[in-house]
C-alpha cells in the first residue's frame, strides 16, 4: 500500500504521467466535463470531498508552476479564493518556486479545460471552486 497522502489510484496515475506544462483541472460538482477528457470523479456527496481537500491531496504529488482560476470567484466565492491563494503561497514555499496565477472569465476557463489531461471532480457545492494546475519540474 502507498504511504503517501494520495491513495486514489486513478488520480495518482494521472499525476504520475503529467509532463512539463501538462494541465490538471480540479473542479466543483457542477463544472461540465468534456466527454473526451479523462474524468476522475471523487464526489461522494455534497461537500465530500471539498474542493480544498482535493486540492491539498493533489499537490502532495504534483509540482505546480502556474494556475488558472475563474475571475468570477473573486465576487461569488471570496472565502474559497482566500483559502486557495493562501494554500498556493504555502505551496510556493514548499516547492521553492513562484506559482503564476492567472484569472480568466468562467467561459474561457471552461474552454481551457478541454486541454487538461484529466479533470478531478470534487463534491464541492459552492460557486466557481475550480482551478487548472499546470505541471512544472522540480529541478
Swiss-Prot record:
Key words, A-Z: Carbohydrate metabolism, Cytoplasm, Isomerase
SUPFAM superfamilies: RbsD-like (SSF102546)
GO cellular component terms, A-Z: cytosol
Localisation per UniProt entry: Cytoplasm
GO biological process, one term: D-ribose catabolic process
Main location: cytoplasm
Pathway noted in the entry: Carbohydrate metabolism; D-ribose degradation; D-ribose 5-phosphate from beta-D-ribopyranose: step 1/2
InterPro entries per UniProt: D-ribose_pyranase (IPR023064), RbsD-like_sf (IPR023750), RbsD_FucU (IPR007721)
Active site (catalytic residues): 20 (proton donor)
Pfam families with a match to the protein in the record: RbsD_FucU
Binding site for substrate: 28, 106, 128-130
Repressor recorded as keyword: no
Signal peptide: none
Annotated family: Belongs to the RbsD / FucU family. RbsD subfamily.
Name of the protein in its database record: D-ribose pyranase
Gene that produces this protein: rbsD
Amino acid at each position: 500500500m502507498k504511504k503517501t497522502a494520495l491513495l486514489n489510484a486513478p488520480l495518482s496515475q494521472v499525476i504520475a504521467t503529467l509532463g512539463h506544462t501538462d494541465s490538471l483541472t480540479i473542479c466543483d460538482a457542477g463544472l461540465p466535463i468534456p466527454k473526451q477528457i479523462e474524468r476522475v470523479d471523487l464526489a461522494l456527496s455534497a461537500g465530500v470531498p471539498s474542493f480544498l481537500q482535493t486540492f491539498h491531496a493533489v499537490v502532495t504529488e504534483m509540482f505546480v508552476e502556474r494556475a488558472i482560476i475563474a475571475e468570477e470567484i473573486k465576487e461569488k466565492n471570496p472565502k474559497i479564493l482566500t483559502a486557495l491563494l493562501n494554500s498556493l503561497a504555502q505551496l510556493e514555499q514548499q516547492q521553492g518556486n513562484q506559482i503564476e496565477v492567472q484569472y480568466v472569465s468562467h467561459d474561457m476557463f471552461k474552454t481551457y479545460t478541454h486541454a487538461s489531461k484529466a479533470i478531478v471532480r470534487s463534491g464541492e457545492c459552492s460557486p466557481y471552486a475550480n482551478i487548472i494546475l499546470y505541471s512544472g519540474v522540480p529541478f
